[in-house]
Amino acid sequence: MEPQRKHSTALHTCHPCRRTIPYRIYAVFHTCGIIALMYHHVHSIVNANNTLITCLLLLSDIVLAFMWATTTSLRLNPIHRTEYPEKYAAKPEDFPKLDVFICTADPYKEPPMMVVNTALSVMAYEYPSHKISVYVSDDGGSSLTLFALMEAAKFSKHWLPFCKNNNVQDRSPEVYFSSKSHSSSDEAENLKMMYEDMKSRVEHVVESGKVETAFIACDQFSCVFDLWTDKFTRHDHPTIIMVLQHNETEMMPNLIYVSREKSKVSPHHFKAGALNTLLRVSAVMTNSPIILTLDCDMYSNNPTTPLHALCYLSDPKINFDLGFVQFPQKFQGVNKNDIYASELKRPFDINTVGFDGLMGPVHMGTGCFFNRRAFYGPPTTLILPEIETFGPNRIADKPIKAQDILALAHDVAGCNYECNTNWGSKIGFRYGSLVEDYFTGFMLHCEGWRSIFCSPTKAAFYGDSPKCLTDVIGQQIRWSVGLLEVAFSRYNPLTYGIKPLSLLMSLGYCHYAFWPFWCIPLVVYGILPQVALIHGVSVFPKASDPWFWLYIILFLGGYAQDLSDFLLEGGTYRKWWNDQRMWMVRGLSSFFFGFTEFTLKTLNLSTQGYNVTSKSNDDNEQMKRYEQEIFDFGPSSSMFLPITTVAIMNLLAFMRGLYGIFTWGEGPVLELMLASFAVVNCLPIYEAMVLRIDDGKLPKRICFLAGLLSFVLTGSGYFFLK
């Protein structure tokens, strides 16, 4: 895998961020402030008239202090890296083989044309075509997706040569033909017509819900559609593996469709199970040393992305224990100020450079180049699979369409194949959490593998972001449940991870494992001081009390550092403001309900299902609201009841506080400041409650229930504030 070098031997460099020293100094002062705050809380409990209120505030501040510590662990040694792919020089036959795994599960939430564009964009990489094998896992077992990929295989014979001969940069056909800068040559226009014809056929099939005989009568794969009988369902069906295109001429990549066997009586382990099936099938067919995992909506935006990854994976100084190279998730179509914080800048950019200065970033689930060897035990101890001849170091030299190869591939994709094996525990992607990406990355790090964050100037991948608040919240409820599954298991990062990793790396992983815990201080600080303010009671120090300034300093210091993080990593003030607002929204919705769902699941009172986030944006009115930066609350949903209740409570407290200024004298100033800050953040909610009449407004039922709950909370304050 080691290349020849042009000029300098360095394929990559790294340098520490300039903010490191100031952040370390600030961490010392902020820690002193937190210690002082804890002392104040303990002193208050001893002398408190109402122990319950003081204990709730103490609990909230303990959670805030812990989460600040986890964030600070990622601020102490952030680094930035630069790759030089132009220095990577190797003959085509010397490039390492590359297997690409693309996962999809529902042709209606993840349109087949989206899958097609993702597959074509990576098949067209600036990389020796015969070295690329693209495996598409269809966990929904849909004939619609298979038909779309059959069409893609035909179109690729024209699209790939066009891209490479004309140095096309946008290698997703949909993106290229939608751009104003695409070529107007006859060849390009003919290709566009071919693409539109393919697109219309695929969309017609999806709309009708079945593959009509007229579309496949002359196709060599037409007989495979006979498998879709009345007994065939997405949860119960046989294995289907189709080699739609293979590189026998060394001019085109392999394209393989894989739908693993499903049975209602056998656990399938969601996406982790699908990826492990692809690991085994690819080991049988191609066994490439490098694996790229992609979600079906993350198309390639940079044709040289594999070369950026090879700058690290081919470096003999670091590749012995280099498990994976993680690229950031970037999203297309995000509105100017990112009202839903869809870019997830803190987890995908800011925190990641902090992880990179330790043992490397967490696995983000997509856009990741793996060393295949990393899935088979620690760097120093190879754990062979049950079929030893198909270990990570074997050279696959048989034709992938050979009958014995296809038969074995079908066998390893069976629903009972993993029984009594190490798959999911010691080999492959790990089971036990809905967030298989986070958990797998954590286990690889604990085994001694390192990772690297690679963020080229030209984004490697672009995906689709939710355009409706319901989709944003729903997606993160699932994340919250999965993260808590790790936090409350034997693999808790703080107990299990501290020995093989380090204190800072363990705290970094804790930042995500305990992510849903943000809901505790947000609920307490969103309701308790406001109820107190309405009743004219102080729960914080008054303005004349020296402790008053400790709260002010900690609040302003924390927010100033958060803003600094954002601006230094290329963000804007408006995006930061929307990000911190969405932190509150998530805390009072997705984190709150995720915490609740996990608790019910632990008590066997609820079963969490895996729901695919819709990536289809066909609602024109919804898109229009998104582009105008108007919050879209979508259909009626109880997910918005807590945040609406908190919004009403803060508005009532704010109005009561303004009136009280003239009657209370010194009064509860901190409570009024907190309510004022919350009211400013809740302006889109008030607008959706009262001023709007479109379909994206808050439903009247939610507003009524929130008002009723606010009345109950305010009334109850009369009793517990005594």
UniProtKB/Swiss-Prot annotation:
Q: Where in the cell is it found?
A: Golgi apparatus membrane
Q: Where are the transmembrane segments?
A: 25-45, 51-71, 514-534, 548-568, 583-605, 635-655, 660-680, 702-722
Q: How does it sit in the membrane?
A: Multi-pass membrane protein
Q: Which UniProt keywords apply?
A: Cell wall biogenesis/degradation, Glycosyltransferase, Golgi apparatus, Membrane, Transferase, Transmembrane, Transmembrane helix
GO molecular function ontology, one term from the record: cellulose synthase (UDP-forming) activity
Task: Give the enzyme's EC designation.
Answer: 2.4.1.-
Entry similarity comment: Belongs to the glycosyltransferase 2 family. Plant cellulose synthase-like G subfamily.
Name the job this protein performs. Thought to be a Golgi-localized beta-glycan synthase that polymerize the backbones of noncellulosic polysaccharides (hemicelluloses) of plant cell wall.
UniProt name for this protein? Cellulose synthase-like protein G2
Q: Which gene encodes it?
A: CSLG2
